[in-house]
Every structure is written in structure tokens, then in C-alpha cells.
């Protein structure tokens, strides 16, 4: 009896595993049908009846390079076995659940001549009407190496989904490495976007970002709690840490797919606070250098107002410009290298193409160079002052050296010296060796919330101010 039960369980497990992936079907020929109810052992998808043997449960998402990412178990159907499939691009901010897109492609195709020629396996060429003879699959925009406009006689589309551009040069793309975009102004041509492989992000990024977010919250709370810390520089520091907190919050929400319905809004918000954080770093660099040089440190209220206009106003203007550029060239694939692309590839600005240098890394480079120069001048000024003070004992010299290291480390963080590593990463990101080398400063930047909490909160003077704030002002003892 026990053996029979074990045999039944074994058969069930084997059969379940065999149905997990559809036999003889490429992953990129499948669509998610988990939202479609089963009817008479089949599924209805866009007026097609899909038999059960062409469906299967998938627990992964396959990437273009063949690697897999684990996802929630869902039902997929090998739709391209029933009709030829064609793959059109969809902006990330227009993607809907179950691989749908809200960009109005169907209406646009009706206004042009939506016919495509397909070379079949036997070598014959058939002419297919996109809206009835084919299944239109929607793929998210991915980073593109090339955007090419081809006429009807300049390409061959094969039945297996491969796309040959300009047959005389034999440039062929597999179905997972491209998507199409219609040219409404020229119905006899079409845009083809060749995808590129983007390396996966560093490990433990979500975890480090979440811990950094907590560090930012605690740092802001302490600075708001202790009045002595809320001087002009302290207020600027709070603004900077708040910018980092919002960035970490948006990143964490993106990992949890919370911004799917507001992808563009999340992207522009993240862009604004990313720029603002660098502008506030330059404000603090200027203020530290100014405090060091001036004997009379007069902190008038309008100074902070001016800093606010600069620290928040300039990023707001730049964010408005990026929005207008995206809006003006939204349906122009030939302008992909010129637009910020917020919400196009992901809920963030396009950081792969050289356009990122215009909208993000260019301003960051200018601000980072200013911060580095100011930091060098500040350290040089401090060293000159300290060199005039001679320590009497070796123990005192060692103590001063340790304090100097922490001082310079805190200054480097508050003055944004490490921010230049982001710009360097942009320039060398296509080189595997340098990407690995720059992981250390990138992790330092990613964990800046942890760093500021450790360096500026977990120190003796801050603890003393917290204890004084808790216990209240000390009362003077009366003379006896």
C-alpha cells in the first residue's frame, strides 16, 4: 500500500515537472495567459483557441542572453505555434499587466498599411495583415545599440521570428534581440531597434539600499531633535540626506513593482532628487570652505533661503527641461540618443546612451569637480594650520592623526568627493574589468545612508548632545 502511494506521488511529480515548461516551444514564443479563465480544457486569447497542451506553468523569466530570473509561478501559452508572431516595442511606462501596452498601437496600425512579408520555412513569401493574420507581441523598450529605418525591400522577416536587415550584408537578429516600431509618416518603412545586453546589477543592492534608507531616517531624526546640529550647515546636511532617503525609497518601491502605474512620475521624482543631492553637496562644500576662511561666521536666515533656491530650484528647472524633451520626441525612435528617456526603459533616466551625459552625468561631473577642488583646498588649509601646532609627545601625535583621518573622512562625505565615482562608472561601464574595480566606490555610494549615520551620529559628541537633550539643561547648584 505504501509503495503504491509513493509510486502515485512520483508519477504526479514527474508529470507536473513535464508540464512546467511547454515542450518544443521557445520561451519568446509564449505569452502570459494567467489572467484568462480556462474553458472546456482550452483558453481564448485574441479570438484564438489555445489547447491545454500548448500551455504550461513557468516560474522564471528568460532573458535575451539565455539566463533566467525567478518570478511568481504563472501560466504561459505557446501562442506563436498557432499564428505567426510579430514583436513591437512598448515604453516601460505604457506596459500593462499580462504583456499589454497602452500606447495605441492598434489604432496607429489601422491608419497605415499594416502588411508584412514573411519568409516561410519552405522559402515561399507570404503577405500577412498585422491585425488579423498575426499575433502582435509587446516587448518592453530595452537599451538599444542601433535604431534603423528599413524599407519594405530592405529586410526579410522569417517565420521563426528572425529579422534580416539589408540581406546583401546578412545582418540577422534573433527574435529576442529586437523589437519594431511603426513609422506613421512613411507606411512603407518601419523602425527596428536592436537590443543590447546590459549586465545585471551588483548583488545585495536592494538590501544595502533598504538599510541606507533606515540610516537616512535616523540621521534626519537626530538632526531635527538636537537644536545645536541645526545650524546653517546642519540644515543643508538635512536637505542632502532627505534627497538620498527619497532616492532609496523610490529604488525600494521599484524592486517591489510599486510604481508600475506611475512609472514616469517615479522616474522624474528620482531624477529631481538625484540632481538635488549633488547640488546640496556643492552647497555644503561652499559653506565648509567659507566657514574655514572667515573668522566672523555670520549665519543670516537669508543665506539658507538662497541655498534653497539654488539647491531645489536648479534641479526643478532641469527636471522640467527633461520632461519637455521626452514629451516632444516621445514617438521618435531616431531621437533615442537625444532624449532623457524617463520611463522608456525603466522608471529612471536612460543611463546607457551618451544622452545621459547631457541630462545627468554632465551636471554631476561639473558639481563633483567643484567638490573635489574645494575639498583639496580645505584639507590643505587645515594641514597648514595644524603644521603650526607642534605636538609634544608621540601619543598626542598619534591621537591627532586618528582624529585627522576621521575629520577628512567626514569632510569627504559631506563635500561629495565620492560622487565623481558615479561619473567614472558611466564612462567605463562597457568594460567588464573596470566595472568590477569600481564596485567598491559604487557600494560606498549606494550605502551612503549607512555611512552618514555611522560617521555623523555614532560619535561621542553627538551622543553627548542627545543625552543633554534628553536630560534637559543642567541647573546650577546654589552656593552653600
Swiss-Prot record:
Glycosylated residues in this chain: 40, 160, 170
Membrane topology qualifier: Multi-pass membrane protein
Disulfide bonds: 25-78, 80-85, 89-179, 90-101
GO molecular function list: G protein-coupled peptide receptor activity; G protein-coupled receptor activity
Positions on the Cytoplasmic side per record topology: 226-231, 284-303, 380-405, 458-480
Record keywords, A-Z: Cell membrane, Disulfide bond, G-protein coupled receptor, Glycoprotein, Membrane, Receptor, Signal, Transducer, Transmembrane, Transmembrane helix
Cellular compartments annotated: Cell membrane
Sequence intervals crossing the membrane: 203-225, 232-254, 264-283, 304-326, 357-379, 406-428, 438-457
Signal peptide start and end residues: 1-20
InterPro entries reported for this sequence: GCR1-cAMP_receptor, GPCR_2-like_7TM, GPCR_2_secretin-like, Methusela_ecto_dom_1, Methusela_ecto_dom_2, Methuselah_N_dom, Methuselah_N_sf, Mth_GPCR
Family: Belongs to the G-protein coupled receptor 2 family. Mth subfamily.
Residue numbers on the Extracellular membrane side: 21-202, 255-263, 327-356, 429-437
Protein's recorded name: Probable G-protein coupled receptor Mth-like 6
High-level lineage: Eukaryota, Metazoa, Ecdysozoa, Arthropoda, Hexapoda
One GO location term (cellular component): plasma membrane
Amino acid at each position: 500500500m505504501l509503495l503504491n502511494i509513493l509510486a502515485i506521488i512520483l508519477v504526479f511529480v514527474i508529470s507536473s515537472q513535464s508540464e512546467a515548461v511547454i515542450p518544443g516551444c521557445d520561451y519568446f514564443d509564449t505569452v502570459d495567459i494567467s489572467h484568462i479563465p480556462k474553458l472546456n480544457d482550452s483558453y481564448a486569447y485574441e479570438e484564438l483557441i489555445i489547447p491545454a497542451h500548448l500551455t504550461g506553468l513557468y516560474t522564471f523569466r528568460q532573458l535575451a542572453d539565455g539566463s533566467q530570473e525567478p518570478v511568481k509561478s504563472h501560466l504561459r501559452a505557446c501562442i506563436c505555434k498557432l499564428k505567426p508572431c510579430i514583436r513591437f516595442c512598448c515604453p516601460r511606462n505604457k506596459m500593462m499587466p499580462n504583456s499589454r501596452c497602452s500606447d495605441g498601437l492598434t489604432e496607429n496600425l489601422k491608419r497605415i498599411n499594416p502588411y508584412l512579408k514573411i519568409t516561410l520555412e519552405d522559402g515561399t513569401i507570404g503577405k500577412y495583415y498585422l491585425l488579423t493574420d498575426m499575433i502582435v507581441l509587446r516587448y518592453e523598450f530595452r537599451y538599444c545599440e542601433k535604431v534603423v529605418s528599413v524599407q519594405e525591400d530592405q529586410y526579410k522577416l522569417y517565420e521563426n521570428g528572425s529579422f534580416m536587415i539589408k540581406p546583401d550584408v546578412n545582418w540577422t537578429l534573433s527574435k529576442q534581440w529586437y523589437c519594431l516600431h511603426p513609422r506613421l509618416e512613411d507606411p512603407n518603412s518601419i523602425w527596428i531597434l536592436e537590443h543590447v545586453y546590459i549586465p545585471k546589477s551588483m548583488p545585495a543592492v536592494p538590501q544595502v539600499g533598504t538599510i541606507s534608507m533606515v540610516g537616512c531616517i535616523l540621521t534626519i531624526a537626530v538632526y531635527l531633535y538636537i537644536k545645536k546640529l541645526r545650524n546653517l550647515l546642519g540644515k543643508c546636511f538635512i536637505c542632502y540626506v532627505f534627497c538620498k532617503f527619497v532616492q532609496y525609497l523610490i529604488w525600494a518601491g521599484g524592486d517591489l513593482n510599486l510604481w508600475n502605474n506611475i512609472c514616469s512620475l517615479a522616474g522624474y521624482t528620482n531624477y529631481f532628487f538625484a540632481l538635488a543631492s549633488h547640488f546640496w553637496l556643492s552647497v555644503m562644500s561652499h559653506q565648509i570652505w567659507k566657514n574655514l576662511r572667515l573668522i566672523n561666521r555670520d549665519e543670516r536666515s537669508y543665506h539658507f533661503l538662497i541655498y534653497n533656491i539654488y539647491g531645489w530650484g536648479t534641479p526643478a528647472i532641469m527636471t522640467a527641461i527633461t520632461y519637455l524633451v521626452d514629451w516632444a520626441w516621445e514617438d521618435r525612435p531616431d531621437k533615442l540618443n537625444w532624449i532623457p528617456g524617463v520611463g522608456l526603459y525603466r522608471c529612471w533616466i536612460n543611463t546607457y546612451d551618451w544622452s545621459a551625459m547631457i541630462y545627468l552625468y554632465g551636471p554631476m561631473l561639473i558639481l563633483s569637480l567643484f567638490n573635489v577642488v574645494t575639498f583639496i583646498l580645505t584639507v590643505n588649509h587645515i594641514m597648514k594650520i595644524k603644521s603650526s601646532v607642534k605636538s609634544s609627545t608621540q601619543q598626542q601625535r598619534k591621537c591627532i592623526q586618528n582624529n585627522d583621518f576621521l575629520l577628512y573622512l567626514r569632510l569627504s562625505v559631506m563635500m561629495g568627493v565620492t560622487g565623481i565615482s558615479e561619473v567614472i562608472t558611466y564612462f567605463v561601464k562597457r568594460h567588464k574589468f573596470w566595472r568590477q574595480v569600481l564596485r567598491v566606490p559604487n557600494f560606498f555610494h549606494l550605502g551612503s545612508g549607512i555611512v552618514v549615520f555611522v560617521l555623523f551620529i555614532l560619535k561621542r559628541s553627538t551622543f553627548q548632545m542627545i543625552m543633554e537633550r534628553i536630560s534637559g539643561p543642567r541647573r546650577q547648584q546654589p552656593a552653600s
